[in-house]
Every structure is written in C-alpha cells, then in structure tokens.
Amino acid sequence: GILRETQRWTLKEEMGSFLLDLEWRGEGLTDVSVEKFFVGGLFLRMPWFKGISGTVINSVGEKGSSEAEGHRAVWVDIGMEISGIADWGHIAVLDHPDNVAFPTPWRIDSQLGVGPSRQILGDWKLGKGETTIERYRLVVYTGPLDQAKISRFWKDYVCESRN
C-alpha cells in the first residue's frame, strides 16, 4: 500500500441546521508525493443543471468560480433552488485552523461544485510513517444566505475542537 486513509464522520442537529463533521487522516505507508493540481481531497458536487438558480460565496464575499476559484477562505457556502421547497437549500463547508493549508484555497467550478484543495498551493509530501489530518464541517440548512450565522458556526466549530 501507499497510503492508509481513515475517515470519521459525525452528524448532529443544531439551531435548525445539520452539522456533518469530517476528520480525514492519511498515513504514509511509504513516502508519498502529491503534485500541485487544481483539485484534490473533499469535493462537494451539487445537483446542478443548466438554468437552475444557485450561487457560491466565500467568507470574504467573493462569488462564483470567476471571483473565488483558487482563493483562500475559512468557509464557502453553496446555495441553490430545490424542487419542492420554497427556500433555497444551502451547504456551507467550514475549514479548520489546524488544517495544514489554513485558510485553504478552494476549487470552485461553474456548476456549483466546491472543495478545499491544499495542492492548489503546490506539491506536498508525506513521509513514511507520518500522518496528516484534515478537518471540515458541513452545515446544511434552508432559507436565505446568512453570512453572520455561518461565521458563528465556524467560530463554534473552532472552539469545540479546541476543548
């Protein structure tokens, strides 16, 4: 083997939103090199189709792939219309300050797909016997975009993990 990958997912409900936490661990079973690339790691693909209303915005206010692609941010929110409900559905992906590339640059495509991607910054290596850990929280909610609420969720996430 080359890499031992472990994922731990936890789910809870808070303030009318679902919080899905991911802790990803990669242990080098040999020396591993990951080359610079525009994608990699966690990626959230939305049920996009031509003509659907939706938007992506990051924590610094950049919108869509034309403004936010490859840029660093502590969170990214994807919102879109969903058939059968009046409000938009949203998934905010929160970066964690213990992640190696924090704030991580984000891959944001033109079809509302997003993912944090540390290899946007360049090559990285993991030595044999070394472990790297990446943490993210997905906040799933409906209604209008509320950047202040997402920022509170991010601060709570950081404080929880530090206790």
What residue spans do the PLM features occupy?
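Extended, loop-rich substrate-binding clefts of extracytoplasmic carbohydrate-active enzymes
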Residues: 1-16
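RNA-interacting cores
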Residues: 2, 32-44, 122-134
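Hydrophobic residues positioned within well-ordered beta-strands of beta-sheet architectures
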Residues: 5-7, 20-22, 42, 76, ...
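Hydrophobic beta-strand positions in extracellular immunoglobulin-like domains
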Residues: 9, 25-26, 138
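Acidic (Asp/Glu-rich), glycine- and aromatic
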Residues: 13-55, 149
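Acidic, glycine-rich loop-and-strand cores that form catalytic or ligand-binding grooves
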Residues: 78-82, 86-94
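Beta-strand-rich recognition/accessory modules
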Residues: 91-163
